Swiss-Prot record:
Residues annotated as transmembrane: 11-31, 67-87, 104-124, 198-218
Membrane-topology descriptor: Multi-pass membrane protein
Name recorded for this polypeptide: Tetraspanin-1
Major localization listed first in the record, in broad terms: membrane
Length: 244
């Protein structure tokens, strides 16, 4: 194997190894955050409380739908990354089977396309998330959900709603605390921004992983043909000369 091919395959192997470890870690953290009762217990008790008045129940339902869609999108993409990374590692250590590398290249292109699509969808639906968050906090104050409000206000160190009559009751005239609808959405938005930066780094690494196999796939082994015809012709000429 040529030295440059060995270097490319080595880099590709470690890129896929990093992608595999990151995907497995993301799956583990996702399930831990989603299903471990010890993680953010108070907030889960707020979102997954089902005996609320209709307006508050509808607002919580919309947030739950968001959480479920985002959660399973992350898990699904992570599982796809695991399969793709394993196939990439196999193709990098098995140079004689280009079929593995072609399959890997197709899968990682599909994976990157899905990741970009999910990122664009989240950006497009960002205003919807903002509206759902505002509706949730507004419904808590409107229905006077005392337990939910206490959890939210203690968690985010906030009070009231932006441009609302409830602010005098809950915040007081001299309060410097941010409004709860703003504080909650800012927290969610910051998390989305951090996730977007991480996704951008992953996409850059995956783009490199897409480019690396291309020189190997388009390269061809050089074949050498040895012709003995001149030697045969020379022997024939010598034979004719000896006849005379």
């Amino acid at each position: 194997m040529a030295t440059w091919k060995f270097i490319i395959r080595s880099v590709l192997f470690f890129l896929d190894l990093a992608m595999l470890l990151a995907a497995l870690a993301l799956i583990a953290v996702g399930f831990w955050m989603g299903y471990d009762s010890s993680f953010d217990t108070d907030l889960k008790n707020v979102i997954y409380k089902y005996d609320d008045p209709k307006s508050l129940a509808d607002a919580k339902f919309n947030i739950r739908v968001w959480l479920i869609v985002v959660f399973w999108s992350i898990i699904g993409l992570s599982l796809g990354a695991v399969v793709t990374a394993v196939l990439g590692m196999i193709s990098s250590v098995w140079p004689k089977r280009k079929g593995f590398m072609i399959t890997y290249l197709v899968l990682i292109i599909v994976l990157v396309s899905l990741e970009i699509g999910c990122g664009v969808a989240v950006l497009v639906r960002r205003n919807s998330l903002h509206d759902n968050t505002n509706s949730l906090i507004d419904a808590m104050y409107t229905t006077n959900s005392v337990n939910d409000l206490k959890i939210i206000q203690d968690k985010y160190n906030c009070c009231g709603i932006e441009n609302s009559l409830f602010n005098v009751m809950y915040c007081g005239p001299m309060s410097q605390k941010p409004h709860c609808d703003v504080a909650v959405f800012d927290s969610v938005d910051n998390t989305m921004m951090i996730s977007g930066i991480i996704l951008l780094v992953i996409l850059i690494l995956q783009t490199i992983a897409i480019i690396l196999p291309v020189p190997i796939l388009i390269s061809r082994k050089k074949t050498y043909k040895y012709s003995y015809e001149p030697r045969v012709t020379q022997l024939a000429d010598i034979t004719e000369d000896t006849r005379f």
